[in-house]
């Protein structure tokens, strides 16, 4: 079966990755990060998607979001990327291509894979050497979960309640889960980006049948699940 560069059903959970052209910085100061998030809020109000996790790095952006019928990912990302690029070009006098391609997207199954993807996103600043604790990085969703930092932008991960019976337990277990994924970070990244989607064998095979594509099965395996617990510690 032919392989496509993108799977874009109108409804689904997507990990979206957008990079600056030639991996150049797209955020230079706090106001740039904040402007991007403000733009995202405005677009969310118009397109009714749920944002579960995000991380804004200096030269790229990770979003983990769920789209709804009538509001495609392509519409959302086209508006978001264009609006921020216009802001940046006006502020810094930039000329030429701003983003590298349009964006990359990966469908994610609503299962442990969704949590593994969330941890990967929120560990980006740690792996980049920008901080030792993801809670210290201000431009990600980690503190929304680990510390209950308020957010007008974020919706709770659909699997949030699997982390415990109370908010305090869930926050503690979530933090332990994310930090526990550090040891698997490189292996997850290498395996993950060789595919078009992240999920179980059944999930990937259903996508192959639905979209008439081939999804790589190299190194497939479930993320470790034992660290997601509802037990008090």
Model-predicted segments: where are they?
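Short acidic-rich active-site patches of cyclic nucleotide enzymes
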Residues: 60
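Short Pro-Cys-Gly-centered "Cys-loop" motif that presents a nucleophilic cysteine in a tight turn
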Residues: 1-53, 57, 66-233
